[in-house]
Amino acid sequence: MVANWLRLIATGTLLLASMAIGGCSTMKVEDFAGKQPILKPEVYFLGETRGWGMFHDRFGRLRRQFVVDMVGEMQGDAFVLTEDFVYDDGEKERRVWRLDPSADGAYQGTAGDVVGTVQGRAAGNAFNWKYRLDLKVGDGTWRVAFDDWMFLQSDGIVLNRATVTRWGVEIGTLTATFRKSVPDVAGMGEPAVRPRALAQAAE
């Protein structure tokens, strides 16, 4: 998941995300099976995407902000997503996800700092994945769990909210907004000129 992100995204977007997808832990992704537009990570994040995000601790205090640039590509049957983060304190970080989608909407995946296998599922305009991550904290690391939700909106923006826990106790919330780097068609999150790989992935 920089101060000037507020000038790029409407101030109310993250508030809307918090209101719309609060209480994620009680939701099931199947509840959104009939919602449009359809969100498939390997379709939406194919090519270039930019995101703006922030992390609040359990007391509601803003701890960190970031901008992330992402590039997604199909490598055989796997979807590889490279994320380059720039945090408001100047720190930079790269994470590379490898996701294996299946026809029933289930996903399995890995990343360098993720513990074990990522488990995810998509339905309708929603995608939920759960994973454990070794998170840098000061000079050490914390092993934390993410319950991560994404929702594709009709204007092509994806709203993201993840609850972060340690030893089963919530320690904070990550909220982010993602937007494609090319214009959308009909506000459905699809680029004006669809690359061949994107068209094939959507079929």
What kind of feature is each model-predicted range?
Residues 1-13:
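Bacterial N-terminal signal peptides that target proteins for export
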Residues 20-23:
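C-terminal motif of bacterial Sec signal peptides marking the signal peptidase cleavage site
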Residues 25-27:
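Bacterial signal peptide processing site
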Residues 32-48:
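N-terminal helix-cap/turn-to-beta initiation motif at the start of protein domains
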Residues 45-53, 160:
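A short, Trp-centered hydrophobic/proline-enriched beta-strand micro-motif
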Residues 52, 56-137:
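Central antiparallel beta-sheet cores of small beta-barrel/beta-sandwich binding domains
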Residues 62-68, 141-146, 170-172:
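Amphipathic hydrophobic-ligand
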Residues 147, 151-203:
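Glycine-rich, aromatic-bearing surface loops/beta-hairpins
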